[in-house]
């Protein structure tokens, strides 16, 4: 039981770090002191460290169980997980193609961020969050072990919480333009028109 609590606490640490450094007040304070590149380095480094801590907290080392212990393999779950993971990866690539130029450039220059509503963003406001959830669900299907499920469920929960806070930040930043966009595109699933 304690091992699950450790995973939950370590995953929560990642969530607090990620949301904390993403909050406008903290972000602006760091940018004022160390610039956009400094913020980017701090955010990336601390995100990697806290996610690595959460990952290692699982103390799970049987990543190739399907080779070393093939009797544990559940083909339907495994194949479903591969399909779900590939779907999530493709969705992440599609979303990144649309935002990568704008978002990455905005962090490295003084350009003002633009509201992206093209491509996959025309149907889903947060496709990267959906892609993350699909990949985490795939991990549960491919690795049907309780400790892996706890880790993935913690990160899925944080993803939804992060999407909620991101949504609030976008409404504040873009105002009516974003409120209009919300009418046309679904939160995390495509809006049926």
Say what each PLM segment does.
Residues 13, 50-54, 83-91:
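Hydrophobic cores of alpha-helical transmembrane segments in multi-pass inner/ER membrane proteins
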Residues 23-39, 67-193:
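Cytosolic-biased juxtamembrane loops and peripheral soluble domains of multi-pass membrane proteins
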Residues 58-66:
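Transmembrane alpha-helix boundary signature
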Residues 42-59:
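A generic, lipid-embedded transmembrane alpha helix
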Residues 1-5:
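Feature marks short, highly hydrophobic, charge-poor N-terminal signal-anchor/signal peptide-like helices
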Residues 9-27:
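N-terminal signal-anchor/start-transfer transmembrane helix
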Residues 7-15, 48, 156-157:
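Alpha-helical transmembrane spans of integral membrane proteins, capturing the lipid-embedded, hydrophobic core
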């Amino acid at each position: 039981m304690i091992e699950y609590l450790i995973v939950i606490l370590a995953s929560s640490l990642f969530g607090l770090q990620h949301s904390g450094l993403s909050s406008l007040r903290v972000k602006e304070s760091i940018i004022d002191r160390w610039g956009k590149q400094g913020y980017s380095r701090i955010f990336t480094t601390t995100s990697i460290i806290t996610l690595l801590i959460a990952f290692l907290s699982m103390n799970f080392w049987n990543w190739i169980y399907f080779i070393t212990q093939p009797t544990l393999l559940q083909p339907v779950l495994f194949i479903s997980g591969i399909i779900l993971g590939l779907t999530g990866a493709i969705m992440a690539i599609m979303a990144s193609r649309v935002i990568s130029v704008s978002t990455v450039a905005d962090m490295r220059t003084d350009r003002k961020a633009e509201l992206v509503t093209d491509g996959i963003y025309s149907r889903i406001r947060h496709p990267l969050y959906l892609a993350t959830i699909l990949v985490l669900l795939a991990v549960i299907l491919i690795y049907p072990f309780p400790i892996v499920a706890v880790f993935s469920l913690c990160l899925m929960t944080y993803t939804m919480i992060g999407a909620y806070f991101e949504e609030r930040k976008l409404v504040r930043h873009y105002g009516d333009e974003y409120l209009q966009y919300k009418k046309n595109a679904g939160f995390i699933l495509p809006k049926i028109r």
